[in-house]
Swiss-Prot record:
InterPro entries: IF-2B-related (IPR000649), IF-M1Pi (IPR005251), IF_2B-like_C (IPR042529), Initiation_fac_2B_a/b/d (IPR011559), M1Pi_N (IPR027363), NagB/RpiA_transferase-like (IPR037171)
Positions that bind substrate: R54, G55, A56, R96, Q205, N256, K257
PANTHER family found in the cross-reference section: METHYLTHIORIBOSE-1-PHOSPHATE ISOMERASE
Gene encoding the protein: mtnA
Reaction catalyzed: 5-(methylsulfanyl)-alpha-D-ribose 1-phosphate = 5-(methylsulfanyl)-D-ribulose 1-phosphate
Matching SUPFAM superfamilies: NagB/RpiA/CoA transferase-like (SSF100950)
Site annotation Transition state stabilizer: residues: C166
Active-site annotation: D246
Similarity field: Belongs to the eIF-2B alpha/beta/delta subunits family. MtnA subfamily.
Protein name listed in UniProt: Methylthioribose-1-phosphate isomerase
Organism: Azotobacter vinelandii (strain DJ / ATCC BAA-1303)
Pathway the protein acts in: Amino-acid biosynthesis; L-methionine biosynthesis via salvage pathway; L-methionine from S-methyl-5-thio-alpha-D-ribose 1-phosphate: step 1/6
Ranges that cross the membrane: none
Amino acid sequence: MRERLLAAEKIKAIEWRDGTLHLLDQRLLPQEERWLSYDSASGVAGAIRDMVVRGAPAIGISAAYGVLLGARRRLAAGGDWRAALEEDFRVLAESRPTAVNLFWALDRMRERLARLKDGEDALVALEAEAVGIHESDREANLTMAQLGLELIRKHSGSPQALLTHCNTGALATGGFGTALGVIRAAWLEGLVDRVYADETRPWLQGARLTAWELAEEGIPVSLNADGAAAHLMKTKGITWVIVGADRITAEGDVANKIGTYQLAVVAMHHGVRFMVVAPSSTIDMSLHSGEDIPIEERDGRELLEIGGKRVAASVEAVNPVFDVTPADLIDAIVTERGVVERPNAAKMAELMSRKRLH
């Protein structure tokens, strides 16, 4: 399966080349494919905040390169560069509050900085760490694709209908994708009849990104309004809802794109299995339950305006961009360390005690 996934790879969103971070501007897709280049930590933080790059794993990878770029500038400026670099850590950390992969990547870079030996080249060490974070995410995606595929096949060996939310493919990760990586693997094994992609308001990641990724690979996909999901589960024989995650707690509660919680509730009502696919860097064992997860709220204009024009006069908007799905609504959490079915605190602790599989 690894070789087949590698052979099918067509899309990527992050490149580290010639000492510069290159990001595919996801705000413009699918109408325009434009790459933007970054050479500073503040620039990378802005790209994360403004959603040039999005998806928890991709945010973490970008932040790691942001630290490297910040260190290069601070070293060139002279003086106490390590103290000055703390400002770059702060700016990057504040760019998106919910995706724990961001803080995990920053912690990895800070720990590598702390391990520098006398005479060791700081930039060489930090570059190796950032590239390692990038490559390990790609490997994790391959492992999760195989594990998720096996879970689908365990319940049915026939082609089936799947539903997904937001975008969890190559655009959101270091390669292949989390939930979309599982769907890709299932398609290659003949287990997918059709994928239903929620449009995912208000940024339309499903309409602009997921539908585009799947169509690029020839996977049958139908775009649907977010509000149509319950009707589709009732009438289209959907067997799995497969989503990603931005943060998972020690009890197995999952923060993901707004609308995920209601999908899980509806899936349970209709007897549709619910799978979450995310690398172990998304699991925050310091948080006991989903109530502890900070939920980002973005500018209400994302709802009140279309194409820069106001469509709802004289009203306010509430715009939380994540919600929390309780563990008891989840059939399985798939990570590169293994699969947790019917997650709870004990199972999550056992998962996180394992060594990585890749």
